[in-house]
Each structure stands twice: as structure tokens, then as C-alpha cells.
A protein has these predicted regions:
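Bacterial N-terminal signal peptides
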Residues: 6-16
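Small-residue-enriched, tightly packed secondary-structure blocks
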Residues: 20-234
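Positively charged n-region of N-terminal signal peptides that target proteins for export
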Residues: 1-4
Length: 234
């Protein structure tokens, strides 16, 4: 058991070091993953993508299990601008996913994960501190397909909806028990200055870095800003 633990920890630490080597590449990969997921025929319902206040993309989340397993991933969150988070898409902030999972066999599984943050309470929690899904914020597997006809009340009431893609299969997935937190160190490396997730998302005039342009462009193309959807007019 000790030997397995050492192997798994070496895998995690080694992957973390490699992941930290190039934050720009990680951010660019977020755009690639988001585009590929939206190209799937039965993907995220258009209505949900359009009304989401933020989108988090975690490429290659890895689960490592030792009886009681763990998961980790690094990615980015993009939110709509404006005090009510209902404007055009803004600049990305880097985020980290961490947590435990029970029941995995010894080994690792890589999965791309997308979260939709559906209301301001969820956004504020994510900008403030580390958030445990299913704890301080409600979370559920997101419905998929072109419409919301098959969605459940649970998913529609949740603050965060989660989706995954593994081995070419895309589906809503529950990630309760995992945690999301701002990765401000990674954001500082991307922007070249001292920044926080809240400052990036809510601060005035934060420019989208070149490495994040593809991700923002994908969101603008698939869920463009629409003046009629502003919350004040709903």
C-alpha cells in the first residue's frame, strides 16, 4: 500500500509541476476543449449556455484512487461582465479543482470537465474562496441536448451544473465533494502582475490575454451577448 501511495503521489506531483510550467498553454487548451465539447451533437443546451453567468473549463481532470481517491485539475473561469453578470464575456481567471472520490480502483483517469455557474450566489462564492460542490453551493449533473425538455427540477435549481467528456463520451456528471478555488498564482503568471479572480472578473478594463482569446471567442460565438437577455429586462 505504501508503495502504491508513493507511485500515485509521484504521479500527482509530477503532473502538477508539468502543469505549472506553462499557464498560457493551459488557457489555450481550455478554448480547444470548450470548442470540441460544443461541437458534439448532444451538448450543453443552448438555453443554459446563454443564461449561465460563468463557465469553468478544466481540461484533463485526473482522478487518482487509493481506496479513497482524489481528483485534481487546472483550468479557467470566464464570466459575463457587468454587476449582474449579464453582459459580454470577460477576461478569464485561472481556477483549480481538487477533492476526494470514493470507490475508484488504483489508477488514474483523465476527463475534461465543464461547469456552468447559473446564478450570482454561485459566482460570488467562487470568487470569494474555495468552494465545495454540494456543500457551500448546490451542484448537479447538467442536462444535455438541444433543449431543456428532459431537464430535472434538481438541475434547474442548482447553482452549478457540471459536464464531463471522457473517451469521446460527453455527459452530465455529478462532482459533489470536489472543490473549486481561484488559482491566483497561475492568474498572476498569465497577466504578468498581481491579480485576483475577483479583480479579473469584476474589475474594470481587464483585457483578455492572447492565450485566452480562443476560449472567449468560443463563448461569444456560441452564447453571444444579447441586450434583450439582460436581467433588468426579464
Amino acid at each position: 500500500m505504501t508503495r502504491y501511495l508513493g507511485v500515485a503521489l509521484c504521479f500527482v506531483w509530477g503532473s502538477t509541476i508539468l502543469g505549472a510550467a506553462n499557464k498560457d498553454s493551459r488557457l489555450e487548451n481550455c478554448g480547444v476543449v470548450m470548442q470540441e465539447i460544443l461541437d458534439v451533437p448532444d451538448n450543453i443546451p443552448q438555453e443554459l449556455l446563454e443564461t449561465a453567468e460563468c463557465v469553468i473549463v478544466i481540461p484533463s481532470m485526473t482522478k487518482v484512487a487509493l481506496g479513497i481517491g482524489g481528483s485534481y485539475g487546472r483550468g479557467a473561469m470566464v464570466c459575463r461582465t457587468g454587476a449582474a453578470f449579464d453582459g459580454p464575456w470577460g477576461a478569464p481567471a485561472m481556477y483549480a479543482l481538487e477533492g476526494g472520490s470514493v470507490g475508484f480502483q488504483l489508477g488514474a483517469e483523465s476527463t475534461d470537465v465543464v461547469f456552468l455557474v447559473m446564478n450570482t450566489r454561485g459566482v460570488d462564492a467562487l470568487l470569494s474562496s474555495k468552494v465545495k460542490l454540494g456543500g457551500s453551493v448546490s451542484a448537479a449533473a447538467g442536462p444535455k441536448g438541444r433543449s431543456l425538455e428532459a431537464s430535472t427540477d434538481v438541475s434547474m435549481r442548482s447553482e452549478i451544473l457540471s459536464y464531463s467528456r471522457a473517451r469521446g463520451l460527453f455527459a452530465g456528471v455529478s462532482l459533489e465533494g470536489t472543490s473549486l478555488r481561484p488559482d491566483d498564482e497561475a492568474s498572476e503568471e498569465v497577466y504578468g502582475r498581481t491579480v485576483t479572480a475577483r479583480g479579473i472578473v469584476m474589475g474594470p478594463g481587464t483585457s483578455v490575454p492572447e492565450s485566452g482569446r480562443h476560449l472567449v471567442d468560443v463563448l461569444e460565438k456560441n452564447a453571444p451577448y444579447n441586450e434583450s437577455q439582460k436581467k433588468e429586462s426579464r
